[in-house]
């Protein structure tokens, strides 16, 4: 398995393309100059395209991915109704979902042969919309509205329209600020990192009709932490055994172990990392974690070690200015 790591650096308007080898070392293979401040990125389900959100001219760009080395070639673009904060796709590669924090909306862009062709739906009134996350069964779009302490739930119709479910939302505790999400590979649980109180919620997905329950909330910070809480990103290993979340004020990654059924998280430790880690990701082998420092302008690669999933630093690499997003593609 070959793996390519993409790092988005909006301040220098670049995507750095790296080869990740089996020992966890990175080799720079390409630097792409992007027409705008590049922030969120996602790889298409068929691994043929990288979709990128840019500003100040709000657009989604599609780059064709070379199958041999992961190099990028610009292919298409499509306008967006707000500044892109988060970007994702459905599992069949029919639609791109874009959450916009500043605009307070989530939009759906239709794809034809992998290329974005236009917005087909926009839902407004999502104050502080920070991500859009399709459920493993491709039925439900989970959309955290950070400033409203709620996660809105939509069914995605065959033509890409978003239909509010019943119930239409789940709520966090007041002041939590739900932000980013991941799903357990067993498709029974979701995990949401809350930005404003630096906690992680575990949501049990009981059935497709919206019977959803928060079964655990866990503080992700050290006991003696008294500064402003400012959590950012969350990821889970492919085997579902280890979960990670980062806080930008403390510049740390919290390590969680996950119970076998996915219902219970346990804090295992804390990894100091790059300054102001806004984005990180886990590779497809589940052996490595790559974190980007928005203020250090560096990325660090960590090996995921042992039963606890603790992190061991393997190397640091200079990237562009203000790196914010990390995506790993296997090909």
From Swiss-Prot:
Top-rank EC class of the record's enzyme: hydrolase
Gene Ontology MF term list: 6-phosphogluconolactonase activity
One record GO biological process: pentose-phosphate shunt, oxidative branch
Source organism, top-level taxon: Bacteria
SUPFAM superfamilies reported in the protein's UniProt record: Nitrous oxide reductase, N-terminal domain
Reactions that this protein is recorded to catalyse: 6-phospho-D-glucono-1,5-lactone + H2O = 6-phospho-D-gluconate + H(+)
Pathway this chain belongs to: Carbohydrate degradation; pentose phosphate pathway; D-ribulose 5-phosphate from D-glucose 6-phosphate (oxidative stage): step 2/3
Positions of modified residues (N6-acetyllysine): 287
UniProt KW keywords: Acetylation, Carbohydrate metabolism, Glucose metabolism, Hydrolase
The family this protein is said to belong to: Belongs to the cycloisomerase 2 family.
Name of this chain's protein: 6-phosphogluconolactonase
């Amino acid at each position: 398995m070959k793996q390519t790591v993409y790092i988005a650096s909006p301040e220098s308007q670049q995507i750095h393309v790296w080869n990740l080898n089996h020992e966890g070392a990175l080799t720079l293979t390409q630097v792409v100059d992007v027409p705008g401040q590049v922030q969120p990125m996602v790889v298409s389900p068929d691994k043929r395209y990288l979709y990128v959100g840019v500003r100040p001219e709000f657009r989604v760009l599609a780059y064709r991915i070379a199958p041999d080395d992961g190099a990028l070639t610009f292919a298409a673009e499509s306008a967006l109704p707000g500044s892109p904060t988060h970007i994702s796709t459905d599992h069949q590669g029919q639609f791109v979902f874009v959450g916009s924090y500043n605009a307070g909306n989530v939009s759906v862009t239709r794809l034809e042969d992998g290329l974005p062709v236009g917005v087909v739906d926009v839902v407004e009134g999502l104050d502080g919309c920070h991500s859009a996350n399709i459920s493993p069964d491709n039925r439900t779009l989970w959309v955290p509205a950070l400033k409203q302490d709620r996660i809105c739930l939509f069914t995605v119709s065959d033509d890409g329209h978003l239909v509010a479910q019943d119930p239409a939302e789940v709520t966090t505790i007041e002041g939590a600020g739900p932000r980013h999400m991941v799903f357990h590979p067993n498709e029974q649980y979701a995990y949401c990192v809350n930005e404003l109180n630096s906690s992680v919620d575990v949501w049990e997905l009981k059935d497709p009709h919206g019977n959803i329950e928060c079964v655990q909330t866990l503080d992700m910070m050290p006991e003696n932490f008294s500064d402003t809480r400012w959590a950012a990103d969350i990821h889970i290993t492919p085997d579902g055994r280890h979960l990670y979340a980062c806080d930008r004020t403390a510049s740390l990654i919290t390590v969680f172990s996950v119970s076998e059924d996915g219902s219970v998280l346990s804090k295992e430790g804390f990894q100091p990392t790059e300054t102001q880690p806004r984005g990180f990701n886990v590779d497809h082998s589940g052996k490595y974690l790559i974190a980007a420092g928005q203020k250090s302008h560096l990325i660090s690669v960590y090996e995921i070690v042992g039963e606890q999933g603790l992190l061991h630093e393997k190397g640091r690499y200079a990237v562009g200015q203000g790196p914010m997003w990390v995506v790993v593609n296997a090909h």
